[in-house]
């Protein structure tokens, strides 16, 4: 696709959806990741995203294509798939509340993520493509919350103040190389 833009549509603008998972374990307590933070991917998914990100940067710098990379931190919406922890939790909490389910199995409860609303992030993507010069941008809120905090709020929303009896930690859901903390710096 990048080669086609270079050869046949050099004025086209291209958006690459990169991911905060590219940063991996590259963090210190109370620090944020920005466009200059080194990548240390810890999964095949993150590694493939680093490859795609670097390809866009290379085509932009070498051939002048208008390719921008949005380094997206976790973005959520009501249509997010149930395979993602936030939707898994909200779906299970509703089912538990209505007596349709007894518990929920989760992996690492200590993981911290920078969660934002997908609709807001799409607006930022569009604004990126309106710029005169292509560049890379972190798309994030700058705040993190743990899975535990997410559980607290989700269960409290349905009037359950103690979620611990409903949550089972299952080693099967633990990632082999967990990224414990991601917080973006959206200042750019």
Predicted regions span which residues?
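Short, conserved SAM-binding segment of the class I
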Residues: 1-4, 153
